[in-house]
Amino acid sequence: MANYTAADVKKLREMTGSGMMDCKKALVEAEGDFDKAIEILRIQGAKDVGKRAERSASEGLIAVSGNTMIEVNAETDFVAKNQEFIDFANKVAQAADAANANSREELEAVEVDGVKAVDALQELSAKIGEKLELKRAVTLEGDKVAVYLHQRSADLPPAVGVLVAYEGENEEAARAAAMQVAALKASFLSTDDIPAETVAKEREIAEATAREEGKPEKALPNIIEGRLKGYFKDVVLLEQPSVTESKKTVKQVMDEAGVKLTGFVRYELGQA
């Protein structure tokens, strides 16, 4: 005869976050001793962390606090939308912002409720039963930063996050620029930010492609410049057609709004 009740199992699940069958097994092993059952589950959870370390964690969320953005990963979207996981990520983001965290190492070192984030993460991993990972963090310099977070579906936390640093008073225009980055994935703010070797390589590709197409020699310079401009429109934020006013570039829209963009960063869940 079982020396525990359904209420005991329910209470143990609520206290530890462990699965129902794990709670039942722990109560059986502990012969109904509640405190001992908790200890058994904690030990088992710690053992399982090592096994989980080999598994892939590609779900999760993007969280933002102030000028800082972080990515925290889990194995499944079921855990990604777990409120405890979301609350943990938001707490870490706040701590990362206070510390101006700018790398994975700095992110892991921030403290949450008096505990290093990486240690708090392992405790949560043992409780939830999935591999969790503090993947990356960035702090964008600037007195003013516009934020845009995009959810892939209404029941999931943000999977894309953008920070845009700007000067000026039009926050709405700056946020529109952040939405632009989320949608069109610009790689550079201006053409001046593109490395010279990258421009040279694109020029080589444009010329080689034009020659393969049999374009007239005299027309090559104009064709190459035209294709370079097309490349810039794809990868340079200020050169892209605005998603809000398609006949204007982002630079034109920002100039009209009295906004100067000074930097941006884009995170997408599961990408480097």
Swiss-Prot record:
Domain of life: Bacteria
Start and end residues of each stretch annotated as Involved in Mg(2+) ion dislocation from EF-Tu: 76-79
Alphabetical list of InterPro entries matching this protein: EF-Ts_dimer_sf, Transl_elong_EFTs/EF1B, Transl_elong_EFTs/EF1B_dimer, Transl_elong_Ts_CS, UBA-like_sf
Main location: cytoplasm
Keyword Protein biosynthesis set for record: yes
Family indicated by similarity: Belongs to the EF-Ts family.
Name by which UniProt lists this protein: Elongation factor Ts
Origin organism lineage: Bacteria, Bacillati, Actinomycetota, Actinomycetes, Mycobacteriales
